[in-house]
Amino acid sequence: MRSAVLVLVALAVVACKGSDGGSGTGSPGGGSGGGTSAVGTGSGAQPDPSADDQSRFDQERQPNEIVASLGLKPGMVVADVGAGTGLLTVHVARAVFPGGHVVATDIDAAVLDYLSARMEAAGFDSIVEARQVSPTDPGLEPNTYDLILLAQVDHYFDDRVAWLTKAAPALRAGGRLAISNRMQNRAPAFAAAESVGFHVVTEVNDVPGQFVALFELNP
């Protein structure tokens, strides 16, 4: 059971990241979603997957539009990188249910506690695995994933090209890389992906000021 101090630190980290999201290698907890709440004030404080956090995220970030552009289907295996507290992860899990699996990664173990609580509350704890990874290692098994999702997180990587080079072997044949971010991060994201050997398949700009691009590895 985590101390109140640890909970408050996690909350402070997430609050600082609220404007950008994303954990990657720079800031922990919140690429796909970073809101948190806590129950209690003493040493027994517990993660609380607040419905208010989810509602606010859904309104501001329009995750249904993002997920709809990913082409997810039941049974798919997805890596949600820099998943934070799971505000987007819950939508991804819903899209691959039943039969699918989501590995939600982050560099912050405390933030992943909130993600696990959110998945349990939503009924997706059986298909979502919270996984702590290092800042420079994707921590993904080779030849496993139908989709690797980077949602407002790649701009935190110290070296996009190095990270993508390590992540690419985790994709199955025909698997895709999805990058969703604000428009000011589009050019470096595309440049990094293309330098690793990806080419863009589709790009959607349904959410104002944001892009969602799907990439596949060159033959």
Task: Show where each model-derived region lies.
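C-terminal motif of bacterial Sec signal peptides marking the signal peptidase cleavage site
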Residues: 13-15
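A short glycine-rich, Lys/Arg-flanked "PGG" loop and its adjoining helix->strand segment in the class I
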Residues: 93-94, 161-176
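Conserved SAM-binding strand-loop segment of SAM-dependent methyltransferases
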Residues: 123-136
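A short SAM/SAH-binding and catalytic strip from SAM-dependent methyltransferases
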Residues: 145-160
